[in-house]
């Protein structure tokens, strides 16, 4: 994104800025953790790469106020997974797209957790009918069988890379690519995206029906949910351990939230069984 800003947009060298958001999680490289709003991810890894501005997630007005000629890109998760399945206000991504167009800024969407059917769409940004300039994907791209990641972007962005200036030792690994293609074939042929869209409302309704003084709120979209506990519950991790012993695998995140991400092949009866355990 910065190279695009210098070579295409004409931002003065060394002055490009990328807008990012509180509660973000984009990985664990030094540059990425440098703009995390979580101290535990940053501790012991500085000094960090400059040129990132941290803004409140879900607040499009804050993005509008942060715009200036040297902004290169907006990097955003359409739904924040690591923060506990935080869904932004309706229209948020559409407003970011409008602001990006208005100021000639790239809109880059991180779909590493939310993409490839998880929310009931191929990509979560489709819920708002937008088209980003760049999309990052991984995790489900190989169905959990092999490490593979990719970036999808418009030609104007990809063409700033010429042979020899950027790459990685195992980039284009043929085994990873073969596994990725097979996983995408399964996603389409077995209609797993449609399954997530069909079963998502059932999962949401069952979660909202939980009546417990320990539950602060539930949030879900497609087959992806967060159950946020009240502070008095003493944190989500001990409940995740207890649920594991009873046959339900889930993950704690941000201390108080139980995160559920069932496989897209799950059935309605299996959802019911899991929620009975919960």
Regions found by a protein language model. Give the residues of each.
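Conserved N-terminal phosphate-binding loop of PLP-dependent enzymes in the Aspartate aminotransferase
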Residues: 1-278
């Amino acid at each position: 994104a910065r190279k695009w800003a210098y070579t295409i947009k004409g931002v003065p060298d060394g002055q490009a800025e990328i807008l990012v958001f509180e509660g973000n999680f984009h990985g664990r490289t030094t540059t990425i953790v440098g703009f995390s709003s979580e101290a535990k991810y940053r501790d012991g890894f500085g000094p960090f790469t400059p040129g990132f501005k941290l803004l409140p997630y879900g607040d499009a007005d804050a993005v509008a106020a942060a715009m200036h000629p040297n902004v290169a890109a907006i990097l955003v998760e359409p739904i924040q997974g690591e923060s506990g399945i935080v869904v932004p206000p309706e229209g948020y991504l559409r407003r970011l797209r409008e602001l990006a167009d208005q100021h000639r800024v790239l809109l880059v969407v991180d779909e590493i957790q939310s993409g490839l059917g998880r929310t009931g769409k191929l990509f979560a940004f489709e819920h708002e009918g937008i088209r980003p300039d760049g999309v990052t994907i991984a995790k489900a791209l190989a169905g959990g069988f092999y490490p593979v990641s990719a970036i999808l972007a418009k030609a104007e962005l990809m063409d700033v890379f010429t042979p020899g200036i950027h790459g990685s030792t195992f980039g284009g690994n043929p085994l990873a690519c073969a596994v990725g293609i097979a996983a995408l074939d399964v996603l389409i042929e077995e209609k797993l995206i449609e399954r997530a869209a069909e079963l998502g409302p059932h999962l949401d309704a069952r979660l909202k029906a939980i009546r417990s003084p320990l539950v602060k709120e539930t949030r879900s979209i497609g087959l992806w949910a967060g159950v946020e506990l009240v502070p008095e519950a003493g944190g989500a991790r001990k409940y995740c351990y207890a649920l594991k012993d009873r046959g339900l695998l889930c993950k704690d995140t941000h201390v108080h939230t139980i995160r559920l991400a069932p496989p897209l092949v799950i059935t309605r009866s299996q959802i019911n069984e899991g929620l009975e355990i919960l």
